[in-house]
Amino acid sequence: MEQLLGIKLGCLFALLALTLGCGLTPICFKWFQIDAARGHHRLVLRLLGCISAGVFLGAGFMHMTAEALEEIESQIQKFMVQNRSASERNSSGDADSAHMEYPYGELIISLGFFFVFFLESLALQCCPGAAGGSTVQDEEWGGAHIFELHSHGHLPSPSKGPLRALVLLLSLSFHSVFEGLAVGLQPTVAATVQLCLAVLAHKGLVVFGVGMRLVHLGTSSRWAVFSILLLALMSPLGLAVGLAVTGGDSEGGRGLAQAVLEGVAAGTFLYVTFLEILPRELASPEAPLAKWSCVAAGFAFMAFIALWA
């Protein structure tokens, strides 16, 4: 028991150190600032951004969405079994079967997607004056020739970037808490180490991508560091909670509530991935095949890690 506790505490500090190191690297080194980059340097940063976009895409589909769907289905099955009497089993078995076949997980993830869509639309409706955007972003996104040459259609307004960055941080924070919670609840040393290594493998790349995203959005260094620090604390927080509640009772809908929150977080993450990250990285027309290769490489790496996650 003491060995298991020591391993989990080691995982806690490893998660904290890796997240801080990977997240702060793009913020602390000026080489990653795309605004001042020119020529080959700028293209390399663009391709790194495409790799991070592929990592986000893989994390959204292969980890967050997959885990949310599995957990929601499992918790709904438990919830329905616990709240069904013997008489109801005999009289409404067909109805229960129909309820079990309904895609609850997909619905919850979609609700998370539309919830953020609504919040963003509401913010833009209430603050129409914010549509101006920053000078740097206007230079990067402006220029009618980009819209004419590129086939991806109209790009999102640059003023939405900070809001979507906030949504990205919140969704990743939720997911990080649940990842840490899962590590903290593991019953054996082998299971704890295996899950922690899987989390470390994909979390490092994801947080590095978050750091790059904050830098490219022109976030001040102070707020960027503060954001990474908060994100870094989420997995250790979840792990600490897992240690505190090990052996506790998961009845009373607590597991279902956790699964629903994870589904909503997955939906918000997909929203930001498809409407902010991918369009921004694919906006400029240079090296389209190289960009595709980088996005595919990032996704493939996350799909490979999903074998052990």
Curated annotation (Swiss-Prot):
Expressed only in prostate and uterine epithelial cells. It catalyses: Zn(2+)(in) = Zn(2+)(out); Cd(2+)(in) = Cd(2+)(out). It is found in: Cell membrane. Changing residue 276 to Q: Does not affect transport activity. Reduces affinity for H(+). GO terms for biological process: cadmium ion transmembrane transport; keratinocyte differentiation; zinc ion transmembrane transport; zinc ion transport. Zn(2+) binds at residues 175, 179, 202, 276. Induction: Shows a dramatic induction in normal epithelial cells contact inhibition. This is Zinc transporter ZIP2. It comes from Homo sapiens (Human). The lineage of its organism: Eukaryota, Metazoa, Chordata, Craniata, Vertebrata. The gene is SLC39A2.
